[in-house]
């Protein structure tokens, strides 16, 4: 521990965000990183705990606590305090293939488990990680390192999201020949088209993919396995196949008038914006536009927040975000102690922007849609909303939301974005390979394994565990790589 009093000597200092007025004019990332000197002070705040929950990655109660990748957080915090940035990068890359992604989009499970955060402000772990990886690129440390020996084994990975990329990176470094198939026109999966550019600029993805290509990973875009390419062909040509297709099947809602024109899934809205932004700077009008419209977002999660922020950048007339459940408390309750993940209300960037642009929080709690209203041409023009109240089922003890009779009211709306989560992977891929799925429509495997019921076919990521975080997808990719390597070589050092 380089500075035992660091957490007392220095206050937490976060990267400064651009003003709302400035940042909504474009789709760029909007934080100014701390200087190296200031970041080193933040590293000094780490207490080097005897039991570092930040990196523990463990189940506590009904919640997960700490980093799923078991990042060596106290070690690289201490190293950056000492100015040893290269050594910090070397420790970081042992456990995390893509700190350039997680330092931008991870909700920082580590910080919520930080001991400093139990009675004060947590260490700026995510910002420290960002500083380490960006310094590595600036100093030429993050460069291609192709394996010196090849095993002669060939592996096909279907899907180039975070789990597929992590598996590809691990297995390629082991010396296997890896080909990644992606049905979209660009590599990245969820990272490319599911997360807006202002949270993760796509040049950051391309930068890492270029390194992976130099190291020998082959990428084939615009190839829809299960349709363009038969599963049997891949099974015949490759020693192992890993399915990393994500949980891309959006959850729909059953509401009267759902067929109205102007109702879209959030993922389609976000993808259309990012693709048009990258293709032509949003100049050809091919994307789903919120400009001048009253927008309603159904769903209160991260994707819903991204829809709010994107709609504001389009120039929406108004934005309303519906959440069925009651508002969470502002602080931890007695049954949600540290170091559990805090079940508290948070206001994310999109909601912050809506508050400043429209003068009020876009979120409406304990409310849902009862009916959509169309004009005589089938275009959406409004919705009937209804308020809800929580009721506990006496038999199961579960909380359900019931409509409050007579609480209906109408709102004007021309664009609805459904951000109600996902229901597993699209079935044509699983059917093509003949793999079994479970009741949640995730690919079925034995507990603790990534092997499917089909010989030589494995799975990882959201397709395996269900809708989750990027950091969990990376963990899944690393785990499946270890299992595949063991099956090919008879032992593994991954």
List the predicted regions and their residue ranges.
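Ferredoxin-type iron-sulfur electron-transfer modules in oxidoreductases and energy-metabolism complexes
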Residues: 24-38, 64-65, 69-104, 108, ...
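Glycine-rich Rossmann-fold phosphate-binding loop(s) that bind the pyrophosphate
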Residues: 158-162, 299-301, 462
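FAD-site-proximal beta/loop scaffold in flavoenzymes
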Residues: 261-292, 392-467
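Feature captures the FAD/FMN-dependent oxidoreductase FAD-binding
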Residues: 149, 154-158, 206-255, 370-385, ...
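Beta1-alpha1 glycine-rich phosphate/pyrophosphate-binding loop at the start
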Residues: 8-32, 41-44, 68-82, 91-92, ...
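Glycine-rich dinucleotide-binding loop and its adjacent helix/turn
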Residues: 131-149, 207-227, 250-314, 437-448, ...
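C-terminal catalytic lobe of FAD-dependent flavoproteins
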Residues: 12-37, 42-45, 365-367, 373, ...
């Amino acid at each position: 521990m380089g500075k035992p009093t660091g957490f007392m000597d220095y206050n937490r200092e976060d990267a400064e965000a651009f003003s709302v007025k400035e940042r909504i004019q474009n789709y760029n990332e909007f934080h100014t990183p701390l200087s190296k000197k200031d970041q080193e002070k933040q590293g000094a705040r780490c207490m080097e705990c005897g039991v570092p929950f930040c990196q523990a990655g463990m189940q506590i109660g009904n919640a997960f606590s700490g980093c799923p990748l078991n990042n060596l957080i106290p070690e690289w915090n201490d190293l950056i305090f000492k100015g040893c940035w290269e050594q910090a990068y070397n420790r970081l890359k042992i456990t995390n293939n893509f700190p350039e992604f997680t330092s931008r989009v991870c909700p920082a499970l580590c910080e919520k488990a930080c001991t400093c955060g139990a009675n004060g402000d947590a260490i700026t772990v995510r910002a420290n990680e960002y500083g380490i990886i960006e310094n590595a690129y600036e100093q030429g440390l993050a460069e291609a390192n192709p394996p010196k020996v090849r095993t002669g084994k060939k592996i096909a990975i279907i899907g180039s999201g975070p789990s597929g990329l992590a598996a590809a990176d691990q297995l390629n470094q082991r010396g296997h020949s890896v080909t990644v198939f992606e049905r979209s026109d660009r590599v990245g999966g969820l990272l490319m088209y599911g997360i807006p550019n202002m949270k993760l600029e796509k040049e950051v993805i391309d930068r890492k993919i270029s390194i992976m290509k130099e190291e020998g990973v082959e990428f084939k875009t615009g190839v829809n396995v299960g349709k363009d390419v038969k599963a049997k062909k891949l099974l015949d040509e490759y020693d192992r196949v890993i399915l990393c297709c994500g949980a891309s099947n959006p959850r729909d809602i059953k509401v009267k008038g759902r067929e109205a024109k102007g109702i879209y899934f959030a993922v389609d809205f976000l993808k259309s914006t990012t693709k048009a932004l990258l293709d032509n700077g949003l100049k050809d009008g091919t994307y789903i536009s919120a400009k001048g419209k009253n927008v309603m977002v159904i769903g209160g999660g991260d994707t819903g927040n991204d829809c709010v922020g994107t709609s504001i950048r389009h120039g929406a007339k108004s934005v309303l975000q519906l959440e069925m459940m009651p508002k969470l408390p502002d602080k931890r309750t007695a049954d949600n102690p540290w170091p559990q993940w805090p079940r508290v209300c948070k206001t994310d960037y999109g909601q912050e922007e809506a508050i400043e642009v429209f003068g009020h929080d876009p979120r409406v709690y304990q409310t849902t849609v009862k009916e959509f209203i169309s004009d005589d041409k089938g275009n959406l023009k409004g919705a009937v909303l209804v308020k809800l109240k929580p009721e506990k089922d006496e038999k199961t003890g579960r909380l359900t939301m019931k409509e409050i009779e007579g609480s209906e009211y109408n709102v004007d709306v021309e664009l609805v974005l459904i951000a109600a989560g996902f229901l597993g992977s699209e079935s044509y891929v699983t059917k093509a390979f003949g793999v079994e799925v479970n009741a949640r429509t995730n690919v079925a495997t034995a507990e603790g394994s990534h092997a499917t019921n089909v010989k030589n076919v494995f799975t990882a990521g959201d397709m395996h565990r269900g809708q989750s975080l990027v950091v969990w997808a990376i963990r899944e990719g690393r785990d499946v790589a270890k299992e595949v390597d063991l099956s090919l070589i008879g032992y593994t050092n991954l």
